[in-house]
Amino acid sequence: MVERIINSEDISLLISGRQSNPHKFLGIISESSSQDRIILFRPGAHFVAIELQGNIAQATHHHSGIFSLVTPKGTLPHDYRIYHQNGLLAHDPYAFSPLWGEMDSFLFHQGTHYKIYERMGAIPCDVGGILGVLFVVWAPHAQRVSVVGDFNYWNGLVNPLRKVSDSGVWELFIPGLDEGTLYKWELVTASGEVLIKTDPYGKGFDIPPQVTSRVINSDRYTWHDQKWMENRKNTKDQPLAIYEVHVGSWQWDNGRPLGYRELAKRLAQYCKELHYTHVELLPITEHPLNESWGYQVTGYYAPTWRYGSFQDFQFFVDHLHCEGIGVILDWVPGHFPTDSFALASFDGEALYESVDHKDPLHPHWHTYTFDYRCSEVVNFLIGSALFWLDKMHIDGLRVDAVTSMLYLDYGRKAGEWSPNIYGGNENLDAIEFIKHFNSVVHREFPAVLTFAEESTDFPKVTESVDSGGLGFDYKWNLGWMHDTFRYIKVDPIFRSYHHNDLTFSLWYAFNERYLLPLSHDEVVHGKGSLLQKIPGDTWTKFAHMRLLLSYQICQPGKKLVFMGGEFAQWKEWSPDNSLDWHLLDNPYHASLHKCVAKMNALYCELPYFWKGDHKQESFLWVDFKDTKNNVISYYRFSGEDRSSALLCIHHFSSEYFPSYVLHCQGIKTCELLFNSDDISFGGSGKGNRLPILCVDHNIPWGIAIELPPLATLIFQVSF
């Protein structure tokens, strides 16, 4: 009988839900030299039928849900199928050898299993001609792990996983399941507590607030962006004008946000009209809380189901690529939420979270920080990044809150943190993780860009890892953004006393490769919209907006503008409502919109703006000392070419100068390319007079121009 095959302790562990190796005695067991026995565990069942080589037989019920059937010697997994209570007829999950191999374990525990997304989670696959889903999870502290779903009536006793040696990895292949199956993990902790968890490696989830994981076939979509992917370039010497978008609040139809597919069509067309080269999406990784804007992630491998399916998001990226628009994602490897259904205390103990601090919760966000010393956690995060680049064809990752990762004392008071081994406040493990991340991303996907949201003077953020840097392609220049906003808020009458806010960033502008952001963080939480930050009446506000956006275009560095800024939304951003698109019916907003399209087109067309823009040689001051008139002027050069340049002039006062003289030697020709005060942009129409070359004894020493109030003028000059 079956008791001769299964010892009483194993039976007890199985029935009580604490069995870590069910494959040891379930499935096909060799009973003698002449016969095998199929042993099944179906708790609560009184009858189990088995289809064996075309014939249906009834299994013998022994006790406590254990059934068996004697079969011919040499029975194989594909020889029989089990009739399940839910009507499914499928092969036996416990008849298969382990699919997680020694090399998987080695790479995973080294933190270098870079295609971990093809091995962890719920993977639809074919095992010896039998279709099903391989379930794999890392839970080293658990006594038992089961997968539960409709297919087993959410009963954790039915489908316990096998613990693969001492790796802490558990697996089970369940034949007959397919894409769309909803599931969760049921874990028994070391203390005996039963936890229900979503899949850390889940590629799909139910629509929030539901949090059930969903089996996804990540390779089912047929891509059409081969030309884009083949021609995709690293943009260090290319134009990069990014439109930052929150998917749920860009545009609504019938009282709801656009889905991925409709959004793709409208957003691609919109970006083409305004000459944006890329969109950057606030995190669309799955998250339970709308108010987090996606920055408190529970599904690092899944696009949120709020706006459509996994394949719908792939269509979104595909369509934008086919229309010539790149896609960048905000990615959050710095912290994760405390929700009990997700990563927090995943197997009953701190697994993904760091325990280095006295208070494990980050004081700014009340979230957990990741344990960067743990190779498996590092593999989880880097695997997430590579997943989006591989399976979703993403063109860039903007890493959120890098500063909080770099410093142990970020947001913490004395006594709330412990120094590193050298006595400093640098988080050496996080630094190593960042270098590892950038090295792997740039090796596997050389054309992909990485961006750091980093607000301190931490050195070499955009230096290569081989040169001792962190390896990012670009760093957000938050100092430039804050200085600019501080200056623009001041009444023009008093700006002479704040001139340094305009010029200071140029002292360090070439220490890193910078991106100049006008981001979402500055138009929310009571900070007001861009328009609300600016003093003056309506005409003055819009003149300032044209000046602000053209000033950004002319400054060294790549560009980013958050949605709504391009047409000057009055209200500050709300993630719960659409942008106020009706404003484009107003001439002020429509004229600014037209101005932005012209500026972006000019930016993309002229290499003076972007070729070598991270090098000192691309920039030369003409005059940064005119504090009295609130004017700055400078040249922008295209690489090392000095035969021509753009002359950029920004006038931040409300005065009009019919003849403003700039001392700039050697100019032979001077052509006006852009005037933010042009009537077609809503301006006064001043500044369009031909410049007058100032010559002394046949030596050109300057130009005299008509300088409008609150305006940018851009001239193309030759020497």
UniProtKB/Swiss-Prot annotation:
InterPro entries (alphabetical): A-amylase/branching_C, Branching_enzy, GlgB, GlgB_N, GlgB_N_E_set_prok, Glyco_hydro_13_cat_dom, Glyco_hydro_13_N, Glyco_hydro_b
The name this protein goes by in its record: 1,4-alpha-glucan branching enzyme GlgB
Residue stretches in coiled coil: none
Complexes and interactors: Monomer.
Taxonomic source organism: Chlamydia caviae (strain ATCC VR-813 / DSM 19441 / 03DC25 / GPIC)
BP term (GO), one: glycogen biosynthetic process
A GO-annotated cellular component: cytosol
Catalytic reactions on record: Transfers a segment of a (1->4)-alpha-D-glucan chain to a primary hydroxy group in a similar glucan chain
Function text: Catalyzes the formation of the alpha-1,6-glucosidic linkages in glycogen by scission of a 1,4-alpha-linked oligosaccharide from growing alpha-1,4-glucan chains and the subsequent attachment of the oligosaccharide to the alpha-1,6 position.
Enzyme active site: D400 (nucleophile), E453 (proton donor)
Family in the record: Belongs to the glycosyl hydrolase 13 family. GlgB subfamily.
GO molecular function term, any single one: 1,4-alpha-glucan branching enzyme activity
One Pfam family named in its UniProt record: Alpha-amylase_C
